[in-house]
Amino acid sequence: MDASMTMAEALNYKSPCTPAHRAVELSEHATLTRLLDEGADADEVCCRMTLLMHAIDTEVDVANQSGEPIDSALTAVLLAYGADPHLAVNGQAAYDCARELRHDMAIRLMDRFSTRTTKLAARFRRGRRR
């Protein structure tokens, strides 16, 4: 992929990865949200990375290159659409990736979503028994 490409060209670039992974790579939050809302799998794997692992890697990379504070919007979008932070690919999960890259905000988000999901699942199970 050429750095001089327009956003439209980059999104249409033929790569081995899915459109959702390309949206993550380009930090296109709106495109990622639309793709997930249209049914893209939040846990899809491309190039030995889940979308969540890719998001964490991209967020850290962008912060390191720009000197700006780290952003966790991609991580938050994926977690909101049900990405599993503990899904392992080649023995590593997004949670491990965040710890390794010291993406503390992503770790806190994954902890909160994991707790929230567990609480919601328990509430749903209780509600179904009635």
Pin down the residues of each PLM region.
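Terminal, low-structured helical/coil segments at or just beyond the last alpha-helical repeat
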Residues: 106-130
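Structural detector for tandem alpha-solenoid helical repeats, activating at a conserved register
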Residues: 30, 73, 104-105
